[in-house]
Each structure stands twice: as C-alpha cells, then as structure tokens.
Amino acid sequence: MPRKIFHQLFFAGLWLLILASPALDQPLTQTARSWGQDGPGWYWGLAAYWAGLGGLQMAALALWALAAWFLRQWVWLACALGGFAAVVVSGILSQVIKHLMGRPRPRLGLSPLELIGPTLNSDFTSFPSGHAATSFALAAVLAYFYPRGAWLIFLAAAWVGVGRIASGSHFLSDVLGGAVLGLMTGLPLAYGAMRRQGLLQKKLRRYDSA
C-alpha cells in the first residue's frame, strides 16, 4: 500500500475513533483509571508524567543532536532536529487548543462534553493531551527515519497516552485528539527533515572545511 494512502486511512480511522469516543469516554476512562489504581505507581507515574514530558523529550533530542554532530552522523542529526521541531510545534499547538476549549479533566467528575471556553485554569485544559501530542509527534519522526522499529516506537507513544488516562488527567478522546495532532505535526516535519538531510550535510561539511 502506498505510504500516502496508508497515512490517509490511518488519520481517517483516528478521526472516526474521536467521533465515536463520547459514548466510550466514561467507561474506558474508568477502566484505565482502575489500572492506575491497581498497578504499580512508579510504572504509571513514569508513563503519565515523565516519559511524555516535552521538556525531557527536547533535552534528550538536544543531546542526541550533539552526539550526532560530533560523530558526523548526518541522518541522526536530521532526525534529532526534526524530532525537536515536532515536539516544539505540537506542544505549542496543544497548549493553545486546550486553553481555548476549556474541557474539564476526568478527576472533576464532570461530563467530557461540558466545555467552558477560553481559560487559564489547568483543571479545564483536558483536550487535547499535550503529552500524547508531543509523544506521537516525536514517534512520527522517529518512525519515518527508522520504519523497521515503527511498531515499537508507536507502542511507546501509546503507553504514554494510556498512562495519561490511568492517572485521571485525560479522557480517551483527549489522548486520541493529541495523537492526531501529534501525527499531523510530526509527519510533515519528518518528511521535511528527511528531504533536507543532504543539504544539511553539505552545509556542515562546508563549515568543517572553513
């Protein structure tokens, strides 16, 4: 199947899940929260907070880019820069959207359909999940550069999303919305980073010879 058609079908499937999720939000969110209550706290804490934290992702990518520079690994460098851009852009977009929508978090016990509009109250910034957005944006870039490990990369991103539900921070549709936002951000940036890899290599070699 051509990659373009696969992407279109993938996005269509995610959007259908989001449209269907109002009926599934409450029961599936409660199920995932029970996992968080019954499972080891460190495991879900790692998934819910640290693994998908944009700042840590950017720090790791910066170290990766630095190592790639010293080792003269241009594919690594292009991937790290593309991933950094994906995390930044998806993170900013998710913050803008969630503060404009004003959706309550599950722990408040309110309906996921109850929106209050623009707000700075963090209790009403549920949609979309910023952790899911940055994780799936980064996953899109990594999978684009390293397709053989795509299933494992996206599994890690999904683990972060489930952790956000298990912690009571998000509904299912928040995570799905964040995943779609992340993929729509990450894939174009991955494509751009891949295409500019040769140009980046030429510029850096010119810099070395100067």
Write out the residue ranges for each language-model feature.
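Active-site His/Glu-centered metal-binding helix of metallohydrolases
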Residues: P27, V96-I97, M101, A133, ...
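Interfacial segments of alpha-helical transmembrane regions
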Residues: H7-Q8, L63-Q95
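Membrane-embedded catalytic cores of phosphoryl/pyrophosphoryl-handling enzymes
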Residues: P2-L9, E114-A210
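Structural signal for the C-terminal ends of transmembrane alpha-helices
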Residues: A23, L63-W74, A143-F145, P188-M194
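N-terminal transmembrane-helix/juxtamembrane module of multi-pass inner/ER membrane proteins
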Residues: M1-L63, K98-T119
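Alpha-helical transmembrane segments in multi-pass membrane proteins
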Residues: L17, G82-A86, S90, S94, ...
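Aromatic-anchored segments of alpha-helical transmembrane domains
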Residues: L16-A23, V87-L93, A157-S169
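Membrane-helix interface segments
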Residues: G39-P40, R72-A78, R107, Y146-L152
